Amino acid sequence: MVNTQLKILRVFGPTGAEVSSVLRGIRDDGCPGLRLLERDGEFAICVQVSAPNRAMAEQYCDKWAARLRAKFGDDVFAEGETSLAQATLDALLEKRKLLVAVDEPTGRLLGSLLQPLPHSEAVFDFGTESYADPQKSRRITVPEQLLRRFPGDIVQAAAGRALAALQVTGADYAAAYMPASVGQCPFVLVCDRRGAVACALPPDMNDTFIGNQILDLLRRRLFGLQLTDSCITFRPGHDRPLLVVSEAARSRGNTVRFSLRRRTPPTRDADHTADFEPMLDFDRPAPVSPPSFPQPEQSAAPDPAAPHRTLH
């Protein structure tokens, strides 16, 4: 009896073209079943392998998954159904770190991704101790000396404001999003006690993509992982490298929504229409749909007993 095993790697950072190039190489090396899905910059790479028994199928599936992990390196953030938001939240909880946003637009981007997840209030203040507090918000400003030294530098200004947010709140990380301005592409930035890291963004990205970029930048900073080509690191108030979108990222196209469950016939009720959408199929034979995954349940209300620290 043939046994089939499926493993799903979750990836964030490369473009669709870069991911596709890697998968074509893996396919040409003999991987029997590959499926690529994408949503708001997150990729799900499905490896499906069949063998005469379960042990062999698991061995072959693990082999190809390990090959893919080696190819994508620090771009792999999880396996299975774990989203980038959940993976970053888990890392913050594990390391007992606190995150704040410098302003309401940035807080909204992060809050929309983190709020549905249990225990998110233990690591993110949702503005209550930062931009939504009138007294503290007035203190989260760009230092005057930084403005004088780098007049008109939007990146330095964002870093200075993030540094002020750290000092005002006592948090470990402060995040900022800046839309496009004259002479500067849109970017996201994360600041901690060591300095700042910023990532340039392609134009016309949706809010979820931008929020994911902040979370990925934070994830890489938390674990000391390699940054993407569109990122720079610097100390606020000191000279910095030029922040531009990498050549590969400029060709990034629009995203396609997906969930890890099989497509169902469309209905008029959006709540009962699956949004599984294959982006590319790398199988040589007829494509085989991945097994059905249950619809994720609505997350429960935050646990008041969850471990947390108080912002100052």
Regions found by a protein language model. Give the residues of each.
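Short alpha-helical segments enriched in small residues
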Residues: 56-261, 312
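Short acidic-glycine loop/turn motifs at beta-strand connectors
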Residues: 40, 51, 191-195
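Long, low-complexity, intrinsically disordered segments
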Residues: 260, 274-312
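Accessory alpha-helical/coil subdomains and C-terminal extensions
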Residues: 1-41, 61
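Short linear motifs centered on serine/threonine within intrinsically disordered regions
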Residues: 263-265
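Broad, structure-driven detector of short, well-ordered beta-strand segments within folded domains
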Residues: 34, 175-179, 278
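Terminal amphipathic helices with adjacent charged low-complexity linkers/tails
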Residues: 43-58
